[in-house]
Amino acid sequence: MSEFDDAAVRMTAGADAISEASALVERLNDDELIDLLDGDVPFWPGITDMTSGGYYRHAWPASRNQRTGIPGLAFTDGPRGVVIGNATCFPVAMARAASFDLALEEQVGAVIGREARASGATYFGGVCVNLLRHPAWGRAQETYGEDPYQLGEFGAALTRGVQRHVMACVKHFACNSMENARFRVDVTASDRALHEVYLPHFRRVVEAGVASVMSAYNSVNGEWCGESPALLTSVLRDEWRFDGFVISDFIFGLRDPVTSVRAGLDVEMPFAQQRANELRRALAAGELSRADLEAPALRVVATLLRFAAVLSASAPPITVVASAEHRALARRTAQESMVLLTNRDALLPFDATSVRKIAVLGRLAAVANLGDGGSSAVHPPSVVTPLEGLRAALPDAHVMHHDTDAALARDAELAVVVVGYTKADEGEFVDPGTSAALFGLFPPMDDPRLGRDAPMPDLPPAPPSAPLERDEAVMAVGGDRRSLRLRPEDEALIEEVAAVNSRTVVAVMAGSAVVMPWIDAPAATLLLWYPGMEGGHALADVVFGAVAPSGHLPFAIPRDETDLVHFDADAAAE
């Protein structure tokens, strides 16, 4: 057994994690100590692998030490499922918040943790609890709404479930509630606003025992979040007594490696990038002491020891990934997430036995529309589209489908219009112009330790992946929304279909609020969200009464965009 394993055994007999971790950290030489404080993959080989799809192929290793047996981290992302391999894709987090079912969210977390472990990961970075300040935020779908209490309770539930199998990480700490300007915006907030509005949900997840916290890209009150002693030390550790470790957001999460160590950031993710050379220089120059470097290493190793019993258990077989049981939970979650916004004359539930002819319209009806295409993207082995779900529920009916031909609805017993957004309209966003200003954070391409020719370390085993066909017309652009309304052609289609068929149901796919000036035209309106791999079946279940639509909005929907304050997506007012 390794030295780490011996320490883990002593932990089961009542040994103290800090004492055992201290003994291990003291055994590390200076190079090993510094290597514990960033990713294991050198930057240029790593970024090449990541941008060619590696983000979705394997977990990302960090903080390993082979000599002492410190296992380190094997990171995968979320939150709608495990992003590596072909995992179960649940509805997005905002949809799950609409269920108001904490027990269900904990079950979702347990499945995600189980699939993460089966896929070679030990660390899940998908507990996102950033507060929804404005529905135009492009990554609203990854969080749970606009209420700090609900955010905290759902984040805690997901954490409890995930940590049955792997470590969890809550993100993005803090005030990361806009996308386009996240790399440069400075959020100014009073202590009262921070502690009453923007931080309580993080505290709740910390109190639930989360292993780790991820800092945010933006700055708060003049300090980059990855270099903020106010956030990472004063609030997180001194006030909240957090005893886990802190990682940076990926690639652009810190600007000054030395300052980040002093502030309380423990691990630079996901590569050996800025710290690898700069911390060696700072240690040699006396800018940092060995004790400065031992403190973050101690927090990482102590957390690994606390989770040793969970992580040393045998990993589930890969067959659990997207298993029938997990798909069934994805379907149930989509059912409970759906929100019935209007239902004139009790149109729903509709009697399926009376349907001889149904018109399914809208450009999203036959699209595998799962949400954001960035770091949270999940690639399930199959997706049930709204059209497929409705067709499966009506095996004897004539199902007519067209993206735009409203006339199809004229003679149908029921018309269903599927409209909304895709990953092209909202989601994660890296502006090439903005990222160019951050290229200075990259090491030289010929760096012997981090450059193109640096050797790749052994990576965690990658699960098998099957390709999934996608609608090639749906291109990932994302970012913050420029409007809260549907596309003009979608709004026009709704009006046209409702004008020729009084039994029209509109299903809206989105990650947060949509302004609906057309809402009185159709008989019924459902908020379908990005409903996951079983969303089409869940839609049919609700429309035809197999289940009741029990979801409730986790935010307010304004009647008009002007009812909200201006959303300065580009931080142009700074």
Give the positions of each predicted feature:
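Glycoside hydrolase catalytic-domain context in secreted enzymes
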Residues: 1-574
